[in-house]
Amino acid sequence: MSDRKSYKDLEMVVFDMAGTTLQIGGLIPVALREGFLEEGIELTDEEIRSIRGLSKIEATRNLLEKHIGNPTEDLIQKIHKNFLQKLEMMFDREEVRLIPGAEETFSWLKAKNLLIALNTGFERKYALMILERVGWSDIADTLVCGDEVSEGRPAPDLILESMKRLDCRNPSRVAAVGDTQSDLNAAAEAKVGLAVGVLTGAHSDDQLKLCPHHLIIPGVGDLPKYLS
């Protein structure tokens, strides 16, 4: 896809959080590995890479299916809880940082009267904790979290719920920005007018180019230049 857009063609921009606007991605693999280890399951680096971009509960389910075939819902929830507890402890001692240019891009979009949505696979409790750490509690017009939709990425639910909350009914006037294949696949499923991949997170340029997209840029700080 290669349809160039101006900010004048858009009503809203939907941003992923980890790896796209915030640098917290390095904590997630560690917490996931430790959460599984508590139940005696050791994950490889390749297994952890394979679930990047998926909702955290869906990632847990997929990994358990590979290891034990048919996990119970109780085990899935137990390991997911382990993961979240580990992650919360890491948030207390590790720094969460803004991706360079993210704040400036948000200011630019607001000056153009565009709506901003943040999407994340995290549950709302943890998403709010992360945003508070970086002073972003009120940065977006809406925040849609993994526990507020039926399906996580690569399903389009997070984007569609963002549109619903902000009363944006035409997907062609929506841009979606993310750092994973799941982000771009979700954008395609939602039929957004502009699907943007960024190279500050989980997946490489070559990996992102395997998915439907309109644009791949180094980072969110480059978005205003493209939309001007």
Feature-to-residue mapping (PLM):
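Short, flexible loop segments at the rims of nucleotide/cofactor-binding pockets, characterized by
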Residues: 92-97, 121, 193-195
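Residue-level marker of regulatory loop/turn positions in helix-turn-helix DNA-binding domains and
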Residues: 98, 119, 151
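Short phosphate-binding/catalytic loops that engage adenosine nucleotides
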Residues: 112-114, 213
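N-terminal helical cap/lid subdomain that shapes the substrate entry/recognition surface
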Residues: 3-103, 108, 112
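Asp-based, Mg2+/Mn2+-dependent phosphohydrolase catalytic module
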Residues: 1-10, 107, 123-124, 129-228
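Hydrophobic beta-strand core positions in alpha/beta domains
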Residues: 117-118, 197
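Conserved G/P- and acidic residue-centered "switch" motifs that form tight phosphate/ATP-binding loops
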Residues: 16, 20, 120, 179
